[in-house]
């Protein structure tokens, strides 16, 4: 049984490649086929558990549209997933590392920007971990020349990831982009949990 500050289990469950192929094939107009690949970082990078994420359309996983680094931090009765992204001039050093982890030896904290307001609060539900972006509309994104705030959440088990990824209008809360038809449903197709180092 896990619990709300079990960073080791969360890291093991997150470590893998996830695909929503079944969802995309069942309803192509609503769902693109996306792959999310998360690789464990060496423990010393963040002084604790961390993962590197690349998210891409399955047709071109060599050109991910989202690069993130997560530091899993137990805090009181929950965990925080602290978000970082590579600076624009460092992206080429990172791109591809989720599928070629030897590249991670060249990762450097100096290449990263923190993402204020975008960290996620993670708790244990009894059967899964659930995460929601911290309250306050602070995770701002400009898309289609319009400012939005991220309204993100996820639920993860040892073999599946369900996520909602939306941008909302800061004033009206109207959904401007993202998961309009509901949650993305990803299955783990490659398991990297064996790469998670004890801490």
Curated annotation (Swiss-Prot):
UniProt note: phenotype after gene disruption: Cells are a yellow color, 40% reduction in phycocyanin and grow slowly. The C-phycocyanin beta subunit (PhcB) in this strain is missing the phycocyanobilin chromophore on position 153.
EC top class named in words: lyase
TM segment ranges: none
Single GO biological process annotation from the record: protein-phycocyanobilin linkage
GO-annotated molecular function: lyase activity
Record keywords, A-Z: Lyase
KW Lyase (keyword) present: yes
InterPro entries to which the protein is assigned, alphabetical: CpcT/CpeT (IPR010404), CpcT/CpeT_sf (IPR038672)
Function of the protein: Attaches a phycocyanobilin (PCB) chromophore to 'Cys-153' of the C-phycocyanin beta subunit (PhcB). It does not attach chromophore to CpcA, ApcA or ApcB, the other phycobiliproteins.
Family affiliation: Belongs to the CpcT/CpeT biliprotein lyase family.
PANTHER family, sorted: CHROMOPHORE LYASE CRL, CHLOROPLASTIC
Identification of the protein by name: Phycocyanobilin lyase CpcT
Species whose genome carries this gene: Picosynechococcus sp. (strain ATCC 27264 / PCC 7002 / PR-6)
């Amino acid at each position: 049984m896990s619990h709300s500050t079990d960073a080791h289990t969360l890291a093991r469950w997150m470590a893998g490649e996830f695909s929503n192929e079944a969802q995309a094939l069942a309803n192509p107009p609503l769902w693109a086929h996306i792959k999310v690949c998360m690789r464990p970082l060496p423990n010393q990078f963040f002084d604790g558990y961390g993962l590197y994420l690349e998210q891409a359309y399955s047709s071109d996983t060599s050109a991910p549209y989202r690069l993130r680094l997560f530091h899993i931090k137990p805090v009181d009765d929950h965990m925080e997933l602290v978000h970082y992204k590579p600076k624009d001039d460092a992206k080429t050093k990172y791109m591809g590392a989720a599928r070629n982890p030897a590249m991670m030896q060249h990762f450097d904290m100096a290449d990263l920007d923190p993402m204020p307001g975008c960290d996620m609060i993670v708790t244990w539900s009894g059967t899964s971990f659930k995460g929601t972006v911290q309250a306050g509309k602070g995770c701002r994104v400009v898309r289609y020349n319009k400012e939005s705030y991220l309204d993100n959440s996820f639920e993860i088990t040892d073999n599946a990831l369900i996520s909602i990824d939306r941008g909302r209008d800061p004033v009206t809360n109207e959904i401007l982009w993202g998961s309009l038809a509901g949650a993305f449903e990803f299955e783990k197709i490659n398991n990297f949990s064996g790469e998670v180092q004890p801490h």
